[in-house]
Amino acid sequence: MSHDFEAMFGQVLGQGAQATIYAQGEYAIKLYREGYPKGNVFSEAYIMANLERENFPSPKVYEVLFVNGRYGLRMDRAKGKMMGENLAGNPEKTKATLDVLVDLQCHLQKRGNVGDWAPHIKLRLRNDLTRNAMLSAGRKEKLLGILENLPDKEALCHCDFHFGNVFFDGTEYTIIDLLQICRGDPAADAACSYVSYSFIQRELAEYYLNRYCGTSGIPREDVLQWLPVYAGTLLGQVPEKFKPLIEEFINAAQVME
């Protein structure tokens, strides 16, 4: 049965693999695809509620919805424009925007230790690797061994911080897509961003990494050591066209030995 969700919630603001965002006045409705795990919806609402308490620059969440077989969240509508808008074909503007995002990311990572409400990134990555049926037993064992020896820290990590998840209204920033937020090594957060930018353009990812390391003072190798592990969680979870890149990042574990 088809449903007219635009009539229910308003015009479509954006659409991704897991959810569609609708405008409802000053609110936004994030409506997840049918079959999307119920636990993930409530986890995101829980994370958003805790971020609000810590004055993190993210939308406030108001309720969990269940409409015609699909879960959703009603939250504040992000103000301003997405930082990734109108960057295509303008490399100088792209780099200038990336500079701003790196400064913001480093600032957020230095907010202080995060409470126990946020899962530790090593635990999340361990669970994701263990559940990933696309990894052979040997690869899984190797990546879990690498993960075990990576640093334990307590910084705030968005784990999906890039052009598309930050809005700016000329005064304030708003950060969205908060399900992956963890506490842990800030270098791990940077590794996640590096992979996201690599999906767009490898040169862009390298520019990001150089800028991030220069701003944060974190050595390049500290970021790159997280790549094989994070890439291992993505194998089979991202579009097929990115598989060679994911394989390259996983195989970097051989070079690191």
Positions of predicted regions on the chain:
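Active-site acidic catalytic loop and adjacent metal/ATP-binding pocket
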Residues: 20-23, 144-188
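Helix-rich C-terminal or lid/interface subdomains of diverse kinases
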Residues: 38, 192-257
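ATP-binding glycine-rich loop module of kinase domains
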Residues: 12-42
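Conserved short submotifs of the Hanks-type protein kinase catalytic core
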Residues: 69-82
